[in-house]
Amino acid sequence: KGNDNQLFTDLDVTMETGQVVGILGASGSGKTTLTEILLGQLKPTCQQFRILENGKPVTAGSRSWSYVPQQNLLREYLKVSETFDFYADHHLKGSGKLTKKHRIAGIMDDLGLTEFANKKISELSGGQKRRVSIGIELLSPSPYFILDEPSSGLDALSDRNLLRTLKILAKSANKSIVVITHNTEN
């Protein structure tokens, strides 16, 4: 970003559908830059940069990625259930009410959010808000997810549970999940 530092040399990542892949690095190591390239928000400056999907080259940003940023972008005045309903209307356009309801219930249950359905976002802990942010993006039909520091605000047990849940969701829903983190614990 704005300088001539080479962040990566011969970066080669292979990811299968239903898999969770971690990108681990210290602050300033290029994790955000790589994320912006994958999302198509930044053009790579290297001579050769390719993303292959099913063995065929695709343009960065041309695929449908869901992205959960590190910062909380939730509407604090809404209840958890209202938040999921709001995003389901966007992510699940064309789906019937029953389909939306079942999808929301399944994700909320998987992420341990069912008991907080009637609480306002402003009443949740940081870790609970994080799970809501992840859950609403999991509503998306996108096969690709980037989660930026998903364990931010979570205690060690919640972090392990979240990663286990992400692995299960990746397999059961055929999602490819990229976890961006500096956390070497998990």
Predicted regions and their residues:
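Q-loop/switch helix immediately C-terminal to the Walker
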Residues: 71, 76-93, 103
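Conserved ABC ATPase signature
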Residues: 120-124
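Helix-to-loop junction immediately C-terminal to a conserved catalytic motif
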Residues: 39
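Catalytic Walker B motif of ABC-type/P-loop ATPase nucleotide-binding domains
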Residues: 145-149
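The feature captures the beta-strand-to-loop junction immediately N-terminal to the Walker
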Residues: 24-26
